[in-house]
Each structure stands twice: as structure tokens, then as C-alpha cells.
Amino acid sequence: MQAYINRGDVLLKMNRTEEALAVYKSALNYDATNHDIHYNLGVVALEQGRPDQGLQYLNRALELDPQHKEALLNSAIVIQELGLPHLHQLAHGRLLQLKDLAPENERVFFNLGMLTMDDGNLEEAEGWFKKAIILKKDFRSALFNLALLLADQDRPLEAVAPLQQLLEHHPDHVKGLILLGDIYTNHIRDLDFAESCYFRILESEPGHVQARHNLCVVWVEKGQLEAAQTCLEVICLLLFSILS
């Protein structure tokens, strides 16, 4: 049985999902109650863009082994990503169960944050994101979502610290640079720093429309109207090339 699972795992890593699917289904003929096989079938379904069926397999794995860590995590992620609010309580319970089983897994806390944020429990979500970051200081998604959560709650100055930590570890994080530039433009009013954020994006992505637009706004705020006008003309050309 383990040979089937190992072969399926290798095929899955090689992105040969149809062959992996066939191997796992063959394995079911020998052991229909093997939780790992059902879990792996769920992974294949997710890889193939069939999340509903993937969730069914993950649920079956949990029926056979209620403490299957990977199935607990991935089923909760699928529920959250599919936008199934009627199953959020189930996903929340699975993540809390997994938190006790794997207290050092930062992804558990992050996904608790995402789930509770979707449910509008913003204070609780903030706490989960912060716990995820304690466990993994360079956790890209947790740092950005914490900053975004704070900014959306009209707490932009508090969002600066997680953004700085994000950019310390991931200096080319475009969304982080956009958000930090916006905060420095509209709240801190340090236009030179905001300008530098957008230049950093444009160095690697010259055609990034939002970064260039925000740079135009900075130049208007600085009174550099000629530069701003030229900047807007460049945006028009970029949009024309995108739409044509």
C-alpha cells in the first residue's frame, strides 16, 4: 500500500496528476479505508481545479482519521477560499483543533486570521495574524494582511511597522510598496519617501499602471505639474497598449 502512495506522491510532484489519480484510485481497491489515500485524492482534485470534489475527499479522510493534520488544514483553507460561509464554523473548529495538535504551525494561525476576517471579526483576526508572525517573522501573507487590516480600520500608522517588516524580508513586494506609499502620501505626508516606494516598483515593473498613477499623484502633491502631466501621458499610452 505504501508503494502506491509513494508512487502517487512522486507523480504528483512531477505534475502528472492524471497518473497520480489513477495510482491512488487503484490503491483504494486494496484499502478503501486508508485515510492517506483519500487525502491524496483530495490533493489531486485541488491541483486539477476541482475544489468541491477535493473537499469531499478531505472530509472522508477526516472521517477515517479525525486528527489528520494536513486534511484539517487544507479542508479549512478550501472552505475559506470557496466562500462557503455556512461551513465557516466547521472550518474554524478544525483550525482550532489543529492549533492544539500543531501549535508551532504558523499557517494555522494565518488561516484562522483569514477566516475570522471574512466573518468580520477583525479584532480576533488581528490577533491571529500577529501570532502567525511571531512564529514566522518573514511570513509574507500574514504581514501584508495584518497591514491591510489595520489600514482598512483607519489605523494606517499602525500598519507601517508590519509593512516595514514585510519589505525587510521581501523588498520587492509590490502590494506592500503600494500600501506603504499610499500611507506616506496621505497620512504621514512624506512625499519623498512615497515617491521612492513607487520608483522601487517601476524599476522592476516599468509598466505597472497603479504604481505609475500613484507616482503622478505624488508629483501633483509636490507641485511638479509638468512631470505629473508627462507621467499621466505615459499612463494613457500604457493603457492604450494594454487595451489594444
Language-model features: where?
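Helix-start (N-cap) detector for alpha-helical repeat units in TPR-like alpha-solenoids
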Residues: M1-Q2, H35-D36, K69-E70, E106-R107, ...
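Residue-level recognition of tetratricopeptide repeat
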Residues: D9, V43, I77, M114, ...
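Structural signature of tandem alpha-helical TPR/SEL1-like repeats
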Residues: K13-S26, E47-R60, E81-Q97, D118-K131, ...
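Structural marker of alpha-solenoid helical repeat scaffolds
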Residues: Y30, L64, L101, L135, ...
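Core solenoid repeat modules with strong leucine/isoleucine-rich periodicity
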Residues: Y57, A61, P66-A76, A91, ...
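Amphipathic alpha-helical repeat scaffolds of TPR domains
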Residues: K69-V78, I178-D182, S244
